From Swiss-Prot:
Protein name: Ribulose bisphosphate carboxylase large chain
Example of a GO cellular component annotation carried by this entry: chloroplast
HAMAP family: RuBisCO_L_type1 (MF_01338)
Record PTM: The disulfide bond which can form in the large chain dimeric partners within the hexadecamer appears to be associated with oxidative stress and protein turnover.
Organism the protein comes from: Polemonium reptans
Lineage of source species: Eukaryota, Viridiplantae, Streptophyta, Embryophyta, Tracheophyta
Annotated positions of the N6-carboxylysine modification: 167
Residues the UniProt record annotates as site (Transition state stabilizer): 300
EC number: 4.1.1.39
GO terms, biological process: photorespiration; reductive pentose-phosphate cycle
Binding of Mg(2+), residues: 167, 169-170
CC cofactor: Mg(2+)
Annotated CDD domains: RuBisCO_large_I
Length: 441
């Protein structure tokens, strides 16, 4: 069975058992009345069952309802169908004040019907020939308004300075100021120039997201013809059907696939209603993507440490034990489905590097947009500063130093012999984003 954990807030006067049973019925075989065609099938075989209810600690009228769905209710290899069944109608139920899907357990038999990520973590490292450290990226800013030629120039400067990747922002598609084909050409030129100068393999996430699946695949085909290593997709705004189609194309044609989670906070930000991001992350691993944005813990975007690390492990590891302290409601066995690299992005700069290296470890992408392009000397020195800071943190960690405690000191030491890093340290020494996380356990 697929198991689901729902956070249920019933209307006053509705007992939790009734609310849990209503959720199970509405998201499987039930309707509001008895119908004569019920007799033509075995409802016992197909209905969802609410098998356990527990109160939420510290909340007066909230309960966790556990529901089991028989596997026969779902089409194989279709995240779209899985979500249509489990969260399709039930969230508008009048008997509930609010409903949130906290976690899913996907059984191995169902996991096996998905291709998953086009390549996965190890194949990506082999393609890029980069080992033993997190990968470094940068989102090109301003996100909208640059011409293709100036955009390509910014890409080249960042890659030449020492970054592994640069990135289209999620809303860069094909607008009047910069058509997609022009952008692809100038970015490919920047890639090859930077590769020739540095001797390292470089990538730029070319955003293939489009208004139709056919147009999206057309853009991915053009990227492949240019010989670039990676394309990008906005998986929630583009939809799971489009995402899975692109993931299959990427595996067949040797392209890596970077996934942006634009629109996720509309779905996952409210604590008592919606879908938790750990569910969206699991769905993405099934649908397919080699990278996905996962929050930073330390930057400008929402994300509490233990909860973030919970779904980061769900993205990367093959087997994850149930651990309620990290918000993981079920043990999940991915039966060797390739892993996804978490991408830390949003309001981070060189002073965050020790914390990011310690929190996310080697299998991650650390993405500094403003933290590269905001360097007072320009893009390339900004990239140099980030690369020096990262190499210093990785070396210190490998020597057994405690990054959490000695992080600032490690960065200061490195800045003595890197003027680029020293300038970056000076610019961002006072910048903090300190707000309480909304998403707590």
């Amino acid at each position: 069975d697929i198991l689901a954990a729902f956070r249920v807030t019933p209307q006053p006067g509705v007992p939790p058992e009734e609310a849990g049973a209503a959720v199970a019925a509405e998201s499987s075989t039930g309707t509001w009345t008895t119908v004569w065609t019920d007799g033509l099938t075995s409802l016992d075989r197909y209905k969802g069952r609410c098998y356990h209810i527990e109160p939420v600690a510290g909340e007066e009228s909230q309960f966790i309802a556990y529901v089991a769905y028989p596997l026969d209710l779902f089409e194989e290899g279709s995240v779209t169908n899985m979500f249509t069944s489990i969260v399709g109608n039930v969230f508008g139920f009048k008997a509930l004040r609010a409903l949130r899907l906290e976690d899913l357990r996907i059984p191995p038999a169902y996991v096996k019907t998905f291709q998953g990520p086009p390549h996965g973590i190890q194949v990506e490292r082999d393609k890029l020939n980069k080992y033993g450290r997190p990968l470094l990226g940068c989102t090109i800013k301003p996100k909208l308004g640059l011409s293709a030629k100036n955009y390509g120039r910014a890409v080249y400067e960042c890659l030449r300075g020492g970054l592994d990747f640069t990135k289209d922002d999620e809303n860069v598609n094909s607008q009047p100021f910069m058509r997609w084909r022009d952008r692809f050409l100038f970015c490919a030129e920047a890639l090859y120039k930077a590769q020739a100068e540095t001797g390292e393999i470089k990538g730029h996430y070319l955003n293939a997201t489009a208004g139709t699946c056919e147009e999206m695949i057309k853009r991915a085909v053009f990227a492949r013809e240019l010989g670039v290593p990676i394309v990008m997709h906005d998986y929630l705004t583009g939809g799971f059907t489009a995402n899975t189609s692109l993931a299959h194309y990427c595996r067949d044609n040797g392209l890596l696939l970077h996934i942006h989670r634009a629109m996720h906070a509309v779905i996952d930000r409210q604590k008592n209603h919606g879908i938790h991001f750990r569910v969206l992350a699991k769905a993405l691993r099934m649908s397919g993507g080699d990278h996905i944005h996962s929050g930073t813990v330390v930057g400008k975007l929402e994300g509490e440490r233990e909860i973030t690390l919970g779904f980061v492990d769900l993205l990367r590891d093959d087997f994850i034990e149930k651990d309620r302290s990290r918000g993981i409601y079920f043990t999940q066995d991915w039966v060797s489905l390739p892993g996804v690299l978490p991408v830390a992005s949003g309001g981070i700069h060189v002073w965050h590097m020790p914390a990011l290296t310690e929190i996310f470890g080697d299998d991650s992408v650390l993405q500094f947009g403003g933290g590269t392009l905001g360097h007072p000397w320009g893009n390339a020195p900004g990239a140099v500063a980030n690369r020096v800071a990262l190499e210093a943190c990785v070396q210190a960690r490998n020597e057994g130093r405690d990054l959490a405690r000695e992080g600032n000191e490690i960065i200061r030491e490195a800045s003595k012999w890197s003027p680029e890093l020293a300038a970056a340290c000076e610019v961002w020494k006072e910048i903090k984003f300190e707000f309480e996380a909304m998403d707590t356990l």
